[in-house]
Amino acid sequence: MPSPTGVFVLMILTHLSFGLGQVRNEDQLLMVGQNGDLDSSNPAIHHQQHQQHQQHQQHQQHQSNHNLNNGNMNSTILNTLMGNNAGQVVNSSPGGGGSMINQLGSSTSSVPSVIGGGVGSVGNPWHSAVGLGVPGNGMGLPSSHGLGGNMGSHPHGHALAGLAKLGIIVPGGQGLPGNLGYGGTMLNGGGVGGAAGMGLGIGSNTNNMDMQQGLYNEHFISEHTVMAVFTSQGQVGGPCRYMPATRRQNHQCRKETGLPGTLSEARRLATTHCEEQFRYDRWNCSIETRGKRNIFKKLYKETAFVHALTAAAMTHSIARACAEGRMTKCSCGPKKHNREAQDFQWGGCNDNLKHGKRVTRSFLDLRGGDGDEVSEILRHDSEVGIEAVSSQMMDKCKCHGVSGSCSMKTCWKKMADFNATATLLRQKYNEAIRKAPNQRSMRQVSSSRMKKPKQRRKKPQQSQYTTLYYLETSPSYCAVTKDRQCLHPDNCGTLCCGRGYTTQVVKQVEKCRCRFNNGRCCQLICDYCQRLENKYFCK
């Protein structure tokens, strides 16, 4: 076993091969002095060695990017161990994650714990020369050519956005925000690989976000899907086509060929009705609050609303698609049976609300479980959206008889227009309740109700999913109201946050003085009139 003052050799994995996770190793030797320091006796030699390391690292970066762009690379974990295992390369199965990294640099001595990349140290003044160079103890130091501390602030540190293009994920509470990242949940932008613990994974899939399961907090699937609904535009790669999806969601889209188109319809319903409901409010369904912060950073009242609206739109679209024959694994809803007192016959094709609820809960992963407070509230708010669709079910009837009489009537169950559901959820948004952190979780409330002794039900039980909950007070959204149109001057006073507004006079041309031609039915003739209209815009 080498002593602390011995010679350290760092083996760097330089080439990730195609195929089934096979790796070709190309070793690089970094010369170290007897005391563990870089040999700096000859400055010219030291400078030449440093340039060689830089050129070699650039070659590695170019080769990795080339392989990742092909989209065929297996997810392989890059890893270097310390101590007795210094200089070794440890491989794991594709997507196996970074749990193989069993030590982080924590030395506080003047000697770097690892020289030439690998794991750095907070307490020492050295930068890692080559490699990822992840510092220990909370990202204390940057690295020279790799993932540096403080979001790569070192002049030679690669930007996080660049690493995102390599498909690197930092999961959960250990994560850092990236191009599409939020709340330290994920760092994404290119191919996606597996990750575990505090490790880094390099992925192979550059066409869609086919993510490893279990790498994020419980509420991530729902949060990711809702965010995709309000940010995705056009088609994306993957079986779900119209929105980035997890591996399990992509599997659902493969099994049900009608689901991708139905999800696209749900996205259209959610975004258009959200914008209509908040057209003249400071928040107009934009995910941004100010700068690059978005409403998914914390659980605001707006976050609760978009989760409820997305779940409602998915339930509505799937239930309607079943009844219209656009789904392969469902059809009309269950038939109703007539009672003696009814003066009509149940018939027609009911909207399949039951199937819509089931698929929505599965796609958003709303299954029960012991989750954290945010998970439980997001799950509850999504259920509020599903319940809103259920409450808008109505009877649709058609009369049959001679000469338009209604001697016989056939009825079926049909959902109301989605505008009614969106209006109901907007009302629930206005009445939403902020939940104090020390209150019981939603699951505890549900469990306490379930423990009550069973009683014979005399009337339909009232749903518990009637109120939206949130945790954080919403920001002002004043930073995103510039140039927004107001409804009237009084509305500008609120919408423009006191910055004032400008008035534009717009000429409108519209039909007027309409009449029947020569007094006969039914040819209508109209004149065209000009009308001046004031429009108001925030400064």
UniProtKB/Swiss-Prot annotation:
**Record's subcellular location:** Secreted, Extracellular space, Extracellular matrix
Query: Per its record, how is this protein called by name?
Result: Protein Wnt-4
Q: Which domain of life is it from?
A: Eukaryota
Disordered as annotated region, ranges: 34-77, 436-463
- Return the similarity comment: Belongs to the Wnt family.
| Keywords assigned | Developmental protein, Disulfide bond, Extracellular matrix, Glycoprotein, Lipoprotein, Secreted, Signal, Wnt signaling pathway
Positions glycosylated per UniProt: 74, 284, 419
**Comp. bias (Low complexity):** 51-74, 439-448
Q: How is it modified after translation?
A: Palmitoleoylated by porcupine. The lipid group functions as a sorting signal, targeting the ligand to polarized vesicles that transport Wnt4 to unique sites at the cell surface. Depalmitoleoylated by notum, leading to inhibit Wnt signaling pathway.
Q: Which positions anchor the lipid (O-palmitoleoyl serine)?
A: 403
Q: PANTHER family attached here? A: PROTEIN WNT-4, WNT RELATED
Q: According to its UniProt record, where is this protein mainly located?
A: secreted
Q: Which Pfam families match?
A: wnt
One cellular component term (GO) for this entry is: cell surface
Give a short account of what the protein does.
Binds as a ligand to a family of frizzled seven-transmembrane receptors and acts through a cascade of genes on the nucleus. Acts downstream of homeotic complex genes in the visceral mesoderm and is required for embryonic segmentation. Also required for cell movement and FAK regulation during ovarian morphogenesis.
Which residue pairs form cystines in this protein?
274-285, 322-330, 332-349, 397-411, 399-406, 478-497, 486-492, 496-538, 512-529, 514-526, 521-522
Signal peptide stretch: 1-21
Instruction: List the InterPro entries.
Output: Wnt, Wnt_C, Wnt_CS
A single GO molecular-function term is: cytokine activity
The record's Gene Ontology biological-process terms are: canonical Wnt signaling pathway; cell fate commitment; cell migration; establishment of planar polarity; female gonad development; germ-line stem-cell niche homeostasis; motor neuron axon guidance; neuron differentiation
Q: Where is the composition biased (Basic residues)?
A: 449-460
Entry annotated with the keyword Iron-sulfur: no
